[in-house]
């Protein structure tokens, strides 16, 4: 994993991948700042008239239905169509799927459009796979361990990578399961850390798509980058407000060697 991470982080910072974020209004600014700090370029283009066209020139696309409107649903559908035609990797973040019927129906309708990755908490992933009812809004009520079967089903169904966020992250593809221990509990006290991880996942996939790095390792590296930055930020911050600032700084400052020393990766 270390070599893949070194290469992934280098490619993100060298290539400055352009990430189209169709995301929720609560986290839009934070997501943009996370991408910039990590070395990517954000673009919040989500209107139906422009989404498909932009997805064709972007390096990665994030679909996050956290605060959806009818117009944004249309924009998301168009962006997915544009991404698929252009071969642009797109990431699905199924926010609160299983807990709310309309977004659950929408997510179930697009999951077979071959997302390069799905990133969510355990309850969202379980619900998306049809194995449970979902959590409490953006909060998971299932453990990451419980989501393993659901993640494996979704990985086989989509051909992509499924990432389950929790105290220990789980990264699953058709023939591989990886556990990642990193981060800090303070990450849960700053809104947008999970949603921005979906955007960073799209950045890593976009930066490495033409390389020898697997999609699995690219998704793993994105999660390791965030986890290590969270640990560094927690050492410098005293409360959530200062943590948010320190987290952005750490995403910018951290190098691959530091990340490798801060995270624990286990192949199942």
Swiss-Prot record:
Q: Which reaction does it catalyse?
A: 5-(2-hydroxyethyl)-4-methylthiazole + ATP = 4-methyl-5-(2-phosphooxyethyl)-thiazole + ADP + H(+)
**Keyword Transferase belongs to the record:** yes
Q: So what EC number does this one have?
A: 2.7.1.50
Per the record, the pathway is: Cofactor biosynthesis; thiamine diphosphate biosynthesis; 4-methyl-5-(2-phosphoethyl)-thiazole from 5-(2-hydroxyethyl)-4-methylthiazole: step 1/1
Task: Summarize where substrate binds, as residue positions.
Answer: 44, 192
Its domain of life?
Answer: Bacteria
- Binding-site positions, ATP: 119, 165
| One Pfam family named in its UniProt record | HK
Which terms under GO biological process does the entry name?
A: thiamine biosynthetic process; thiamine diphosphate biosynthetic process
Which Gene3D superfamilies did the record assign?
3.40.1190.20
What are its cofactors? Mg(2+)
Alphabetically sorted, this entry's keywords are: ATP-binding, Kinase, Magnesium, Metal-binding, Nucleotide-binding, Thiamine biosynthesis, Transferase
- Kindly give the InterPro entries that the UniProt entry links to this protein: Hyethyz_kinase, Ribokinase-like
Q: Which SUPFAM superfamilies match?
A: Ribokinase-like
Note whether Glycosyltransferase occurs among the keywords.
Answer: no
Q: Which GO terms describe its molecular function?
A: ATP binding; hydroxyethylthiazole kinase activity; magnesium ion binding
Q: Give the protein's function.
A: Catalyzes the phosphorylation of the hydroxyl group of 4-methyl-5-beta-hydroxyethylthiazole (THZ).
The UniProt similarity line reads: Belongs to the Thz kinase family.
Q: What is this protein called?
A: Hydroxyethylthiazole kinase
From the UniProt record, report the name of the gene that encodes this protein.
thiM
């Amino acid at each position: 994993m270390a070599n893949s991470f070194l290469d992934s982080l280098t490619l993100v910072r060298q290539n400055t991948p352009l990430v189209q974020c169709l995301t929720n209004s609560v986290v839009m600014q934070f997501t943009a700042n996370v991408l910039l700090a990590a070395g990517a370029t954000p673009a919040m283009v989500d209107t139906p008239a422009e989404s498909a066209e932009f997805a064709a020139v972007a390096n990665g696309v994030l679909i996050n239905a956290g605060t959806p409107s009818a117009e944004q649903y249309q924009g998301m559908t168009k962006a997915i169509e544009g991404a698929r035609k252009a071969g642009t990797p797109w990431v699905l973040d199924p926010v609160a799927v299983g807990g709310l019927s309309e977004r659950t129906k929408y997510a179930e309708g697009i999951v077979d459009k071959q997302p390069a990755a799905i990133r969510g908490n355990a309850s969202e992933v379980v619900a998306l796979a049809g194995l449970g009812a979902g959590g409490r809004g953006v909060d998971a009520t299932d453990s990451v361990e419980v989501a393993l079967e659901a993640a494996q089903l979704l990985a086989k169904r989509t051909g992509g990578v499924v990432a389950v966020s929790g105290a220990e992250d789980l990264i699953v593809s058709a023939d591989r399961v990886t556990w990642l221990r990193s981060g800090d509990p303070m990450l849960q006290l700053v809104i947008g850390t999970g949603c921005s991880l979906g955007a960073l996942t799209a950045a890593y996939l976009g930066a490495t798509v033409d390389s020898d790095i697997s999609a699995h390792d690219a998704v793993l590296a994105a999660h390791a980058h965030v986890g290590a930055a969270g640990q560094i930020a927690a050492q410098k911050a005293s409360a959530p407000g200062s943590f948010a600032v320190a987290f952005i700084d750490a995403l910018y400052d951290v190098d691959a060697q530091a990340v490798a020393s801060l995270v624990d990766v286990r192949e199942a």
